[in-house]
């Protein structure tokens, strides 16, 4: 369903957009128009999620890249032995494998919240998991891609805060079906994909609290994400450009 649920492409509409796509972020009149449209889309995503600022919306190539961005850019710098990374047995591999891998790289413990026979998370296991060490990450999907289970987001995010952990939410399945307010949820990061919302493929977005994004290292390096390049050092652009290297998706 990750690719079969997307709408059919209107070839003529795509062809009509080519002149603008080719001119994106280039300093010429067409580029200015394309950039304005690009940033207008960012504001629409901000409003859709009720994020506090456009600076908190990073465009990516999909939910998978968004979640990997957090796992690598935050996880590699903040996890270590004695820390615990928590996800669930309901989660898509995109919100499971990156955390498993980064936990292994950093020496952190990787733990999952099990699922009962009704397809619900066994929240009674949270106390046991908390006893494994210092919980630093709680990653989960709002809605399971396999069973359609609606996970108790408020409870999981509250537990993450109690543990002093960040919360990372996969909203790919939920975004087409329910309103999402990141400020009301209180999550630290949230990822979604355009094609789940009848948009184009290979386009996604990551919401991240500005205070966290500012402290994170870049995930990809290259054009459009730098402020200045010198032989001795390179400085990064402001949010969200710091995480948007290369040609826009």
Each predicted region: which residue ranges?
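Pyridoxal 5′-phosphate
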Residues: 1-249
């Amino acid at each position: 369903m990750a690719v079969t649920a997307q709408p059919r492409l209107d070839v003529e509409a795509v062809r009509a957009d080519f002149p603008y796509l080719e001119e994106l972020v280039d300093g010429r009149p067409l580029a200015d128009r394309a950039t304005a449209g690009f940033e207008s889309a960012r504001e629409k995503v901000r409003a859709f999620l009720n994020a506090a600022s456009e600076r908190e919306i990073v465009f990516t190539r999909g939910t998978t890249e968004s979640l990997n961005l957090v796992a690598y850019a935050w996880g590699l710098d903040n996890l270590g032995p004695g820390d615990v990374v928590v996800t669930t047995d309901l989660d898509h591999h995109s919100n499971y494998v990156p955390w498993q891998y980064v936990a292994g790289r950093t020496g952190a413990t990787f733990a999952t919240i099990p699922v009962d026979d009704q397809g619900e998370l066994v929240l009674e296991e949270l106390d046991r998991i908390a006893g494994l060490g210092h919980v630093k990450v709680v990653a989960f999907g709002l809605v399971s891609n396999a069973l359609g289970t609606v996970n108790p987001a408020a409870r999981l995010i509250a537990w993450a805060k109690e543990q002093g952990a960040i919360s990372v939410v996969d909203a790919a399945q939920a975004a087409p079906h329910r309103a999402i307010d990141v400020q009301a949820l209180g999550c630290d990061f949230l990822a979604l994909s355009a094609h789940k919302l009848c948009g184009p493929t290979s386009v996604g977005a990551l919401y991240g609290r500005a205070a966290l994004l500012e402290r994170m290292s870049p995930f990809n390096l290259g054009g459009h994400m730098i402020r200045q390049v010198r032989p001795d050092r390179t400085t990064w652009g402001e949010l969200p450009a710091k995480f948007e290297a290369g040609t826009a998706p």
